[in-house]
């Protein structure tokens, strides 16, 4: 990639239909883990006009009112009126869960003891990434995209813009010079709205109240292209506008396209599923590498075979920004991080009901107390082992 270029990422709000599905799936996972932390959960959700379907595989001793959890989640998001196309009180909720296949369970059922050789729940490859573009060590385009839809939700909830509705999407294009963010080129924000708001008033309010307060002043250079509801009317949205499915926003959930993705979604999956836990571990590793000052960008790939504890591969790429070689960093990763599935669960304390909060506005780059994978507690040890000075972002 050239050093001067434009890069774009997008995000969606908690009221986007796919995110409604993700949040229901993770709310169900949390409710199960609260009662039985060794449960096996793969909770999938479909939501359409007036309909929610819960399906997947769940093996647990927990006694859960799945229908009520789905309704409560829809209510929290803000779909509390039949005019919105789905209403938590009146929507139909269908439940069709099976138990986990015994053929899969045999490789992961040693989770109750202290043996760290629990096998991976599936084969696959996962990536983690960090860079020094923001204090959170995230790529700037996805970081700003998340903050825009977060602010849309905040102004909707507190009534400052009462005509806002739950569904929204954002997109940010950043100009890079010498490989670093230089300026904001384009901001797109589409928001669902009440039918009586005029488009010019909507556009002015969105630009002045949502977009401008979110953008860093040092990146505003020249005229930014603001595209607000570029098709015009956006009254029909949420699950009425599009069918929502768990796991369809995997790039929004991670790095906005700035890093590869192994293809496995996160929401609704207990941490024995390496699609989720190993991706969290990858972020933890990459963030500590950058926080340690070993590199300004770090990409981690880890892969697994079903029923096998040790990763089949671990790869580190610092894109030429490393202060020591990638081979040295890879060796340090293997020494300082236990990337076996049970080791990850223990290292990041993942058998907790912490997942609903991850299901909107990104799983990474948020300083939430439950997000153990955002800690930089390994950075000092990595820096000392590599013989470099850590950055100021060690926490």
Swiss-Prot record:
Keywords, sorted A to Z: ATP-binding, Cytoplasm, Magnesium, Metal-binding, Nucleotide-binding, One-carbon metabolism, Potassium, Transferase
Amino acids binding ATP: 16, 167-169, 233-234, 242, 248-249, 265, 269
SUPFAM superfamilies, per database record: S-adenosylmethionine synthetase (SSF55973)
Compartments it resides in: Cytoplasm
Protein task: Catalyzes the formation of S-adenosylmethionine (AdoMet) from methionine and ATP. The overall synthetic reaction is composed of two sequential steps, AdoMet formation and the subsequent tripolyphosphate hydrolysis which occurs prior to release of AdoMet from the enzyme.
Organism from which the protein derives: Burkholderia vietnamiensis (strain G4 / LMG 22486) (Burkholderia cepacia (strain R1808))
Cofactor note: Binds 2 divalent ions per subunit.
NCBIfam families associated with the record: metK
Stated name of the protein: S-adenosylmethionine synthase
């Amino acid at each position: 990639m050239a050093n001067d270029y434009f890069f774009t990422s997008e995000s969606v709000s908690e009221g986007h239909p796919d995110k409604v599905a993700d949040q229901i799936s993770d709310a169900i996972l949390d409710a199960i883990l609260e009662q039985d932390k060794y449960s096996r959960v793969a909770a999938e959700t479909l939501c359409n006009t007036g309909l929610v379907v819960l399906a997947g595989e769940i093996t647990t001793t927990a006694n859960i009112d799945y229908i009520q959890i789905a309704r409560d989640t829809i209510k929290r998001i803000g779909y509390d009126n039949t005019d919105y196309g789905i209403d938590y009180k009146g929507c139909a909720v269908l439940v069709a869960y099976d138990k986990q296949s015994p053929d899969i369970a045999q490789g992961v059922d040693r989770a109750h003891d202290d043996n760290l050789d629990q096998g991976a729940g599936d084969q696959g490859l996962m990536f983690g990434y960090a860079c020094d573009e923001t204090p959170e060590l995230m790529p700037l385009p996805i970081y700003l995209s998340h903050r825009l839809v977060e602010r849309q939700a905040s102004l909707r909830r507190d009534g400052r813009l009462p005509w806002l509705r739950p569904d929204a999407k954002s997109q940010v294009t950043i100009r890079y010079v010498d490989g670093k963010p230089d300026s904001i080129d384009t901001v797109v924000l589409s928001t669902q709205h009440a039918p009586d708001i005029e488009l010019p008033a909507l556009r002015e309010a969105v630009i002045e109240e949502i977009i401008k307060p979110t953008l860093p002043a040092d990146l505003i250079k020249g005229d930014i292209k603001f595209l607000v509801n570029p098709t015009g009317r956006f009254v029909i949205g949420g699950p009425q506008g599009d069918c929502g499915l768990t796991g369809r926003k995997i790039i929004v959930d991670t790095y906005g396209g700035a890093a590869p993705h192994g293809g496995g979604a996160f929401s609704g999956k207990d941490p024995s599923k390496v699609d989720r836990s190993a991706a969290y571990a990858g972020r933890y590793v990459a963030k500590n590498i950058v926080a340690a000052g070993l590199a300004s960008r770090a990409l981690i790939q880890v892969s697994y075979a079903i029923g096998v504890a040790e990763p089949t591969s671990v790869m580190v790429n610092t894109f030429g920004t490393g202060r020591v070689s990638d081979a040295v960093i890879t060796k340090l990763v293997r020494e300082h991080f236990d990337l076996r599935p049970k080791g990850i669960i223990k290292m990041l304390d993942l058998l907790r009901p912490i997942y609903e909060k991850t299901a909107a506005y990104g799983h990474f780059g948020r300083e939430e107390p439950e997000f153990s994978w955002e800690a930089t507690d390994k950075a000092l040890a990595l820096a000392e082992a590599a013989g470099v000075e850590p950055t100021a972002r060690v926490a």
